Amino acid sequence: MDMEKLKRMQARGGVRTGDGKGTPRRKVKNVHKSTGMDDKKLQTSLKKLNVQPIQAIEEVNMFKSDGNVIHFAAPKVHAAVPSNTFAIYGNGEDKELTELVPGILNQLGPDSLASLRKLAESYQSMQKAEGGEEKKDDEEDDDDIPDLVEGENFEDKVE
């Protein structure tokens, strides 16, 4: 048997080597860790901190330094006020600030307001760029419409 084939079989776990004559081949049992185990460990750690559940939290938004927001819809929140510890459970979604703007204006702090100003400035510059293109189109359309002359009342001519 060549060494390459032996190494492949050893990697699979199908070859016993060095265990002696009487030892049977045994497959290694793979134990899959579940997230439930992590949750139990987290729960026991939080119980040590004496956390209390906070009811009626509709949403949680965490503002990141790059301007994006981690948004939790209907999360479970536990708090330990003396140790200033908060635990938030739920599915978090990465969203841009523009997606949440109307609903989160009252939640913004001074840092987030600065990023909102930058966002507004970039939006205005985009609008001006689009507006410049539209103005060119408007000027072409204005050639068909005559200018109003002062002193003339066109409504009298209609009647």
Curated annotation (Swiss-Prot):
Component of the nascent polypeptide-associated complex (NAC), a dynamic component of the ribosomal exit tunnel, protecting the emerging polypeptides from interaction with other cytoplasmic proteins to ensure appropriate nascent protein targeting. The NAC complex also promotes mitochondrial protein import by enhancing productive ribosome interactions with the outer mitochondrial membrane and blocks the inappropriate interaction of ribosomes translating non-secretory nascent polypeptides with translocation sites in the membrane of the endoplasmic reticulum. Residues 23-32 have a biased composition (Basic residues). It is found in: Cytoplasm; Nucleus. Pfam families: NAC. Residues 1-39, 124-159 are annotated as: Disordered. This is Nascent polypeptide-associated complex subunit beta. Part of the nascent polypeptide-associated complex (NAC), consisting of EGD2 and EGD1. NAC associates with ribosomes via EGD1. Keywords: Cytoplasm, Nucleus, Protein transport, Repressor, Transcription, Transcription regulation, Transport. InterPro entries: BTF3, NAC_A/B_dom_sf, Nas_poly-pep-assoc_cplx_dom. The lineage of its organism: Eukaryota, Fungi, Dikarya, Ascomycota, Pezizomycotina. One of its GO terms (biological process) is protein transport. One of its GO terms (cellular component) is nascent polypeptide-associated complex. Residues 136-153 have a biased composition (Acidic residues). Its main location: cytoplasm. SMART domains: NAC.
